[in-house]
């Protein structure tokens, strides 16, 4: 069965609608199926509204989704219909104090928002079983969206002048709510812009090594291409396929599998 067929199957069992999100979830599912036992437990860190946790639950995984946001967990619980998926409001310190270890840990689109990503990774190292796998996904800090959308937007926001107010008004008029399909957090600002080299360095400093790198999309979520891709779904699929043909530096996001460094 080819990747396109697998993505179509995945689309039928997830709340994600965007092709790159479905591709990201498929990477996570495949990586976990290859590395953890059938009755293993997966920790979803920074789970937000729980969309990934529920996607994993639909695949039969036992999932424990955690977030520091009461609002996020309340929504995650409200939307959850899977008996094998549960959610709690827990911070890193509580996770360590709990002392439990997990067969797999998912940290998807989280590290770029943290002041100190290495602090969380140290906690995840303690929370992962010796032969477990950590799945990390982050935007490519030098990818099209970060270069042409995220960084200019942050620079404009810092100026906080009439141009920023006009920009916010335009986004609002176009239906942009300032949230993502994965999170309704009040602040989704990117504090870090990871390159592949930076991510590998961060992994090493946290006593992990990256055993697999993958790509997400190219420009389907970059204005003005996003206007067309949002309405014409096949453009999203083509964009994800194009990302596979281009050098990894051109991808919009990195998907990766980490394991504990045995050296």
Predicted regions, residues:
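Conserved SAM-binding loop
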Residues: 25-148, 254-260
